[in-house]
Amino acid sequence: MMSQSPRNFSRRDLFRGLVARGKAAYHEVDDQPQRTIPRPPGALAEATFRRLCDGCGLCVEACPSSVIQLTGQWPELCLDYNHCQLCTQCAQVCPTGALLPATKTELLPTFAYQCHNRLLGYCELCIEQCPTQAIQCEPNQQPVVNEDLCNGCGECRPICPANAIEWQFRKSTEK
């Protein structure tokens, strides 16, 4: 029979163990599935969202801008032809809690090569349309988006005559 004597830990052992646990926790969070499909504003982290959302479509019906579409089982945010009003009606009708009220979407505009301001030096329609004044540019330059000001509403995209605005996910989209 083995004796049950207390094991002595040095301070170094304690910190080594804490660092190892911290690294393990970091890698667990890092292994969460990354979002590849834009969800309605306030969508929880993708894995949680998919677990909670029952695909009822109430958010689609509640959206006054018709920018939420049910694709397969889950809702997607589509800002191709209209913008999100960020009215939170989708979150208010969500019976499962998969959507929370939000003041931003998870998307940011990016500007493609064919941007008229960059090529021709005269177009500022996206700047004029932006309700938060998040887009700025110099003549003959590609517009730049201030990520802190941009709410991802999409008002800039439908107005673009060159169809030069595309979407990227914010760096930290998971909640």
Q: Residue ranges of each PLM-predicted region?
A:
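Non-ligating segments of multi-cofactor redox enzymes
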Residues: 1-175
